[in-house]
Protein backbone atom coordinates (compact mmCIF):
# COMPACT_ATOMS: atom_id res chain seq x y z
CA UNK A 1 0.00 0.00 0.00
CA UNK A 2 1.30 3.44 -0.92
CA UNK A 3 0.78 6.26 1.58
CA UNK A 4 0.96 9.86 0.44
CA UNK A 5 2.40 12.34 2.92
CA UNK A 6 1.82 16.05 2.39
CA UNK A 7 4.01 18.50 4.28
CA UNK A 8 2.92 22.12 4.30
CA UNK A 9 5.45 24.68 5.45
CA UNK A 10 3.80 27.71 7.03
CA UNK A 11 7.06 29.67 7.34
CA UNK A 12 6.40 33.23 6.21
CA UNK A 13 2.62 32.98 6.64
CA UNK A 14 1.10 35.99 8.41
CA UNK A 15 -1.93 35.48 10.65
CA UNK A 16 -4.33 38.30 11.45
CA UNK A 17 -1.97 40.73 9.65
CA UNK A 18 0.13 40.58 12.82
CA UNK A 19 1.81 37.23 13.58
CA UNK A 20 4.55 36.13 11.16
CA UNK A 21 5.36 32.40 11.29
CA UNK A 22 9.14 32.03 11.55
CA UNK A 23 9.68 28.27 11.90
CA UNK A 24 8.13 24.99 12.97
CA UNK A 25 9.28 24.03 16.46
CA UNK A 26 7.22 20.91 17.14
CA UNK A 27 4.69 18.34 15.96
CA UNK A 28 2.02 16.70 18.08
CA UNK A 29 -0.75 14.20 17.67
CA UNK A 30 -3.30 16.84 16.74
CA UNK A 31 -1.29 19.60 15.13
CA UNK A 32 1.89 21.55 14.64
CA UNK A 33 3.63 24.14 16.79
CA UNK A 34 5.34 27.18 15.32
CA UNK A 35 7.38 30.14 16.52
CA UNK A 36 5.94 33.47 15.39
CA UNK A 37 6.91 37.11 15.78
CA UNK A 38 4.34 39.76 16.63
CA UNK A 39 5.01 42.39 13.95
CA UNK A 40 3.30 45.09 16.06
CA UNK A 41 5.05 44.59 19.39
CA UNK A 42 8.11 42.52 18.46
CA UNK A 43 7.25 39.72 20.91
CA UNK A 44 7.69 36.05 20.09
CA UNK A 45 4.74 33.69 20.48
CA UNK A 46 4.03 30.00 20.06
CA UNK A 47 1.35 29.29 17.45
CA UNK A 48 -0.46 25.98 17.78
CA UNK A 49 -2.21 24.83 14.60
CA UNK A 50 -5.25 22.60 15.11
CA UNK A 51 -8.00 21.25 12.84
CA UNK A 52 -11.07 23.48 12.88
CA UNK A 53 -13.02 20.65 14.54
CA UNK A 54 -11.03 21.48 17.71
CA UNK A 55 -12.35 25.06 17.74
CA UNK A 56 -14.45 24.56 20.88
CA UNK A 57 -11.58 23.04 22.86
CA UNK A 58 -9.25 25.78 21.63
CA UNK A 59 -11.59 28.51 22.81
CA UNK A 60 -11.95 26.85 26.23
CA UNK A 61 -8.18 26.97 26.68
CA UNK A 62 -8.35 30.75 27.04
CA UNK A 63 -10.23 30.24 30.32
CA UNK A 64 -7.48 28.13 31.91
CA UNK A 65 -4.99 29.81 34.21
CA UNK A 66 -2.19 27.79 35.76
CA UNK A 67 1.57 28.36 36.10
CA UNK A 68 2.24 25.14 34.14
CA UNK A 69 0.02 26.06 31.17
CA UNK A 70 1.18 28.62 28.59
CA UNK A 71 -1.27 31.52 28.46
CA UNK A 72 -3.36 31.87 25.30
CA UNK A 73 -3.37 35.48 24.07
CA UNK A 74 -5.17 35.34 20.72
CA UNK A 75 -7.09 33.06 18.37
CA UNK A 76 -7.21 32.94 14.56
CA UNK A 77 -9.28 30.89 12.10
CA UNK A 78 -7.97 30.41 8.58
CA UNK A 79 -9.39 27.86 6.17
CA UNK A 80 -9.86 24.48 7.82
CA UNK A 81 -7.52 25.24 10.75
CA UNK A 82 -7.56 27.30 13.90
CA UNK A 83 -4.44 28.83 15.40
CA UNK A 84 -3.86 29.45 19.10
CA UNK A 85 -1.43 32.27 19.83
CA UNK A 86 0.23 31.36 23.13
CA UNK A 87 3.16 32.25 25.34
CA UNK A 88 6.40 30.90 23.90
CA UNK A 89 8.47 29.01 26.45
CA UNK A 90 11.96 28.08 25.30
CA UNK A 91 13.17 24.58 26.01
CA UNK A 92 12.23 20.99 25.34
CA UNK A 93 8.83 19.48 25.98
Show which residues each predicted segment covers.
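A short, low-complexity linker immediately N-terminal to eukaryotic Hanks-type protein kinase catalytic domains
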Residues: 3-21
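Protein kinase glycine-rich loop
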Residues: 22-28, 33
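Conserved N-lobe motifs of Hanks-type protein kinase catalytic domains
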Residues: 28, 64-67
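Conserved N-lobe loop of protein kinases adjacent to the ATP-binding glycine-rich P-loop
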Residues: 37-44
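Conserved beta3 VAIK motif of the Hanks protein kinase fold
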Residues: 47-48
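AlphaC helix of the eukaryotic protein kinase fold
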Residues: 51-63
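Activation-segment/catalytic-loop signature of the eukaryotic protein kinase fold
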Residues: 75
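Conserved short submotifs of the Hanks-type protein kinase catalytic core
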Residues: 79-93
